[in-house]
Structure formats: structure tokens, C-alpha cells
């Protein structure tokens, strides 16, 4: 079996995300305290793809995430989202990239529906449209009847549902997810993962999902990229709903070997 067992690397020029020969160094390289987080990384993500970035702590997942989000720029190389530089043209991506964090990051003085409306307010959507859109997504996430609850009145899983609703409500095409279910119990996380994948596919979104869990990567991704420090691709595999259980087990085994090496 090869590393492209199920499919060729599903990343081509013209995709939503392009990272070309990207290097990121924190501090001045060669000087004490400097750190090379990403090393000559090449990665493309196709439209509609659900990419799971998998790796141990410190392998550069969050640095890649932040470069795609336009929160930091590479030391060298090219980062493009829909053909544009997300760092240099940050304002052009308002409403086009949505982020779901590990914590829900809800404003405690706002109700659930007001928290979902926050992104829409920043996009200057008219108030009636904001409220209707926020309500629609809360209902889709199973929170109908909780629109006027404050975060402290909601469980951890419910709060994360609000944060996911907030991301979808902006109608952003690209969703960036930084271990959004890691703080939840497995039963709650499992249900949310399934709903999240369904909504991404139903609404034609592209998603990049950071995780350190092989099981979560296999459950969420239709492509998994395994990173080894400093953020080099050690394994890249794509699969789909027709991939057999035997093939998935072999992929799991191979990922385990790569991470242990």
C-alpha cells in the first residue's frame, strides 16, 4: 500500500488554499531563542474539501492555521486563499473566512442569538436579516428555544454549537477549525462532529480542521495531512464514503506509524 492508497493527493493549482514553499521562523534564525515552525511546506486544498491537519503538539499546525487566516505572515514562500494574500489583503476576507476555536469565545453579556449575530454586525448586515439568519442557524444546530439564553445558562456542548452557528451564519466559504471539540466529553463531541461534517457538506464549504486525534481526523476529514516537526508533510492521504473499513484500518495504522517515527 502506498501513501496515496485511496486517492491521489487531492490538491491542485486553482484550489481554495495554496501554500507554496512556505517557511515560518519565529525570531531571527541562527540566534538563540529562534524557532523554525514551518519548513518549506507545499500544500493545496481543493474547494469543498474537508482537510484534517493532524500532528503532535509543536508540529506547526497552529502556525499554518494562522497563516491561512491571515493572522501572521510567512518568513518565506507564498500563502494564497482564493488567489489572494490573506495577510496583506486581510480586509478583503471579511465574511469569507470563519474561525471556530477550541473554546467557544462567546461574549458573556450577549445572548446566544446576539452572539451569532456578532459576525453579521461586523459585515453591516441589516438588523432584521441578522436576527433571522442567526435564528435559522441556531435551529439548525439544535438550539431552537435557547436563542435568548446567556452563555452561563448553556452547557459546554451547547455553547460550542452557538460558536459553530456563528461561523456558518456569515456564509463564509472557508471554515478554519482549531480543535473545536477537544474540551467536550466524547459523547457530546461525537454528536457535534457528525453534525458539523453534515453542515459543511450540505452547504458546500471548504474546511481545515486541526486535531491531534487520529480517530477524529478519520471521522471528519476526507483528506488527512500528517505533520512532523517542523511542519513538514509526513503523510498525505485522501478517502471518501466508499473507502472500505479495511482500507480505513490500514490508513489508521499507517498514520500511527508515521506519528511514532
Regions found by a protein language model. Give the residues of each.
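ABC ATPase NBD coupling module
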Residues: 85-101, 122, 127-131, 248
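The feature captures the beta-strand-to-loop junction immediately N-terminal to the Walker
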Residues: 54-56
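Hydrophobic anchor residue at the start of the ABC signature
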Residues: 164
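A short, proline-enriched helix->beta-strand linker immediately N-terminal to the Walker B motif
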Residues: 169-173
